[in-house]
């Protein structure tokens, strides 16, 4: 089967305007492929107001400053150089991930609505508390369900199996899907806690779909 990757670009100019003054001196610029064509334009706007702008590149990204799916390495790679990040795009999926990974302030500018915001630290704190609670549940549980996907780029079966040697006092059940069906997980009522080895956002965004705690492999 032939695969074609077709980029959907937005051609609308991005003008940050007076919001530039709300940003600290050293800024890491990140965006999605939709606005990658406007990155240089935004960089010039920031530099005109005395800001120092940094780009990074993710493992799976095609361009500098690009975030792609769960990959926010373009931000992580420059986190020690910057005071905060500016995300150009819509939605909170990527900026929330950047905030969690880097512990830095993340400002957002939506070119479609011209709205400028800052990630609320309370939201991040709430997520971190949930993660700590899931870790406590994992450590105190004996029957563990390990969610594994067969999707390219997300499959971590080898790392999942390593849990058996690290936690010999627990029983692990490996549940393999392509697309995870949360209803099917309810067929294993004896499982006390789930470990997610697929997209890390599942444990954050989809935890409400489960009656049991779920923790990402990277958080153990």
Question: Where does each model-flagged region fall?
Answer:
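Peripheral docking tails and interdomain loops at the edges
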Residues: 112-116, 121, 200-220
């Amino acid at each position: 089967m032939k695969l074609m990757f077709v980029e959907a670009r937005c051609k609308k100019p991005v003008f940050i305007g007076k919001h530039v003054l709300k940003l600290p001196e050293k800024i890491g610029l990140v965006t999605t492929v939709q606005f990658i064509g406007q990155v240089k334009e935004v960089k010039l706007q920031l530099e005109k107001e005395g800001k120092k702008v940094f780009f990074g590149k993710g493992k799976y990204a095609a361009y500098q400053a690009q975030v792609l799916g769960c990959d926010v390495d373009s931000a992580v790679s420059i986190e020690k150089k910057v005071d905060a990040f500016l995300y150009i795009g819509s939605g909170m999926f990527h900026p929330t991930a950047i905030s969690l990974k880097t512990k830095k302030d993340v400002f957002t500018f939506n070119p479609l609505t011209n709205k400028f915001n800052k990630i609320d630290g309370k939201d991040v704190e709430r997520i971190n508390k949930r993660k700590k609670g899931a870790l406590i549940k994992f450590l105190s549980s004996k029957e563990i369900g390990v969610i594994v996907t067969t999707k390219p780029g997300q499959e971590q079966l080898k790392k999942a199996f390593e849990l058996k040697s690290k936690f010999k006092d627990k029983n692990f059940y490996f549940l393999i899907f392509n697309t995870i069906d949360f209803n099917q997980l309810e067929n294993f009522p004896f499982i006390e806690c789930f470990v997610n080895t697929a997209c890390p956002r599942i444990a954050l965004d989809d935890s409400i779909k489960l009656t049991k705690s779920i923790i990402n492999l990277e958080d153990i």
